Regions:
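N-terminal capping segment at the start of a domain
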Residues: 24-59, 95, 224-234, 238, ...
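Soluble metallo-hydrolase cores and metallopeptidase-like ectodomains found primarily
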Residues: 25-27, 116-142, 232-310, 322-335, ...
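N-terminal hydrophobic or amphipathic helices/low-complexity stretches enriched
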Residues: 21-64, 71, 76-79, 285-289, ...
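Second-shell loop/turn segments in exported
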Residues: 28-36, 50-60, 126-134, 166-168, ...
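His/Asp/Glu-rich mid-to-C-terminal helical/loop segments that flank catalytic regions of hydrolases
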Residues: 240-244, 325, 445-518
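Noncatalytic luminal/extracellular "stalk/propeptide" segments of secretory-pathway proteins
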Residues: 24-26, 46, 50-185
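Bacterial Sec-dependent N-terminal signal peptides
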Residues: 1-23
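Metal-dependent peptidase/peptidase-like ectodomains
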Residues: 105-107, 121, 126, 146-150, ...
Length: 518
């Protein structure tokens, strides 16, 4: 009896294996094999991140990236072009050198902020001072303002610790950790209140300091991790603005507090390039049966320039480029057109994708599905239905074709809610197109690489990025081949608990097409 049962089970399993083998899609199998055995991710990452570098809108590096992508797509036999959608302030970063000259000599770790005017070759040398404490009111601050003339002013709060909270939590006593957090919270509250009493906030006070004759602005936007600062743009029009790493910034702050009168020299060589055109890079594999319907692969191409934009959004860019390469090689005649958009100026407000949506209503109207990736190097772990009522019907069908070793990590949320911002999928969702964000595993993204001075090639987890390229290519293939057109029916959004009013679907917003003007 046992022998007979074992024989039946064996036949069952062999039959099941045969059925599975018969069900394997040769296109999907070839995509997986190509991605694993002939991946181009590493050389693409090197060319984009090490050679081209950061991709701040309006810079020569951004233009170089656009041209590089077009050439790369054409080398794969994929039609590609740069589509102009606006203009921006042209600017090019040069060498930044920041040195403390007194009370001792030390080179400081920091950089000029984006779109900041250049200094002379000799730079600017001046004493460093702090903002006053215990400001009574705006009149009190006005009386103090003449003190900034000819001085560098420290405009960020002096952090009480350079150790991130997770390090405290691991090693400190509970009492010490709680004490530090309480003191830091109190210090932060007083810092903001002090500026408010002066009639300003952390941003607006910079203009007042420049107008009062400050020689320059020194900031430090710590990202709550070892050695990481967030790097954005300057708010001064004529004087240098630099961001210093926490260790050097707090040292200068203490020296100024204790009356040691530190002096620094800042040399910041940048170039103003006038008004320059801004682009999206578009590539497409034309559909053979329904070319007027589109699957869109989406990733913003620009970055802030504190580092090289490896995980924001170099990795998203790599995923989409590799997916397109895989599709062109193993699915060269798709049923629907597969288009990839590498958007410009996402960091300043989704400008490139909003411009594409505004300029291409016929394409947007005929989007079968859009897949966007923009939050780091990790494997995709979450996909939301974005508020489309029937998203489960087709997304679950497409995901079923993806290997289990990839989908086992993915949580789905249906029907989900529409995104009003955050990344470029939101531009399409607002226009009613079924656009889905492929949300990635954290890998300490928010503290260590997002908009920081450490967002570099070495932070990429290529195994995860490879999985994401396979996932994206298969989703695009399945969406293209689907016999059914995807539904755009939207959920009824819930009431806003704060206002008591019905929530509404996000509205399309126009891009900023003439950016970077002072």
């Amino acid at each position: 009896m046992k022998i007979k049962l074992h024989f039946i089970l064996l036949v069952f399993f062999l039959s099941s294996a045969f059925i599975v083998a018969q069900d394997k899609d040769p296109v999907i199998e070839s995509i997986i094999t190509e991605a694993n055995e002939n991946s181009q991710l590493e050389p693409l990452a090197h060319e984009l991140l090490d050679v081209v570098g950061p991709r701040l809108v309006g810079t020569p590096q951004m233009q170089k990236a656009h041209d590089w992508a077009v050439a790369k797509y054409k080398s794969w036999g994929i039609e590609a072009r740069n589509e102009k959608w606006g203009e921006w302030r042209g600017w090019e970063r040069g060498i930044t050198h920041i040195d403390m000259l007194s009370p001792r000599v030390q080179t400081l770790q920091g950089m000029q902020l984006a779109w900041n005017p250049s200094t002379s070759e000799d730079g600017v040398t001046a004493e460093v001072i702090t903002l006053p404490e215990n400001i009574k009111d705006s009149l009190d601050f006005v009386k103090w303002l003449p003190n900034v003339e000819g001085k560098f002013v420290l405009v960020s709060m002096k952090q009480p610790t350079g150790r991130p909270d997770y390090n405290w939590e691991e090693f400190a006593t509970e009492e010490s950790f709680e004490k530090m957090k309480d003191e830091r919270d109190a210090q932060s509250s007083e810092w903001r209140a002090n500026l408010n009493r002066a009639g300003y906030n952390g941003r607006s006070v910079i203009g007042a300091l420049e107008d009062a004759g400050a020689a320059g602005i020194v900031a430090s936007y710590w990202s709550r991790g070892f050695g990481v600062n967030k790097i954005f743009s300057a708010r001064t029009k004529k004087i240098p603005t630099v961001d210093l790493e926490l260790e050097d910034y707090t040292m200068l702050y203490r020296l100024a507090e204790y009356g040691d009168k530190p002096t620094i020299r800042v040399v910041a060589q940048s170039k103003e390039l006038g008004r320059v055109p801004t682009f999206n890079t578009i590539a497409e594999i034309k559909g053979s049966e329904i070319p007027e319907e589109y699957i869109i692969l989406s990733a913003h191409f620009d970055s802030w320039d504190g580092a090289t934009g490896a995980t924001d959004n170099g990795t998203g860019t790599l995923v989409m480029m590799e997916a397109m390469r895989l599709l062109k090689k193993h699915y060269p005649n798709p049923k629907r057109t597969i288009l990839v958009g590498h958007w410009g100026s996402e960091e300043q407000g989704l400008n490139g994708s909003r411009a594409f949506v505004e300029d291409n209503p016929e394409i947007v109207k005929n989007v079968q599905a859009l897949f966007n990736q923009d939050n780091g190097t990790g494997r995709v772990v979450n996909i939301s239905g974005a508020g489309f009522l029937h998203a489960y019907d087709y997304l679950s069908r497409w995901l079923y074709a993806v290997p289990r070793d990839i989908t086992q990590h993915i949580e789905t949320n249906f029907p989900g809610t529409p995104s009003g911002g955050g990344s470029d999928n939101a531009s399409f969702v607002a226009a009613g197109a079924p656009a889905f964000n492929l949300s990635a595993l954290n890998w300490s993204y928010w503290n260590y690489t997002w908009h920081t001075n450490r967002d570099t090639y070495d932070k990429i987890i290529f195994d995860d990025v490879r999985n994401n390229a396979i996932l994206t290519a298969i989703l695009a293939y399945m969406a293209s081949e689907d016999d059914e057109r995807t539904s755009r029916e939207k959920i009824v959004l819930p009431m806003n608990s704060r206002t008591g009013e019905q929530r509404t679907w996000p509205e399309p917003r126009s891009p900023q097409r003439d950016g970077g003007r002072n």
